[in-house]
């Protein structure tokens, strides 16, 4: 099982941020650091075929949703808030 790349900042309640198409977690770094300063453990994900995550010929919402689930399991995250932008928003809705 491949795990997507993520940067993590802060401590507290988990906040997972999923970027939009052609983006990466770093696009959310400024806001992520502010939320981290306000009591969140912020996870800035790089989805497959984006940023520093692995590349794959398989690319659809079902596998991206499973990638996030695999990340949450790997990080032992049982509860979190999720923010998704554009493509990431659709992944977030499928996680709900």
Place the predicted regions along the sequence by residue:
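Gly/Ala-rich beta-loop-alpha elbow adjacent to hydrolase catalytic centers
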Residues: 84-88, 92
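Conserved HGGG/HGGXW glycine-rich cap/lid loop of the alpha/beta-hydrolase fold
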Residues: 7-54
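Aromatic pocket-lining residues of Rossmann-like dinucleotide-binding sites
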Residues: 35, 95-96
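Active-site signature of alpha/beta-hydrolase-fold catalytic machinery across serine-
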Residues: 30, 94-95
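Active-site loop/oxyanion-hole signature of alpha/beta-hydrolase fold enzymes
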Residues: 43, 47-83
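N-terminal cap/lid segment of alpha/beta-hydrolase-fold proteins
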Residues: 1-3
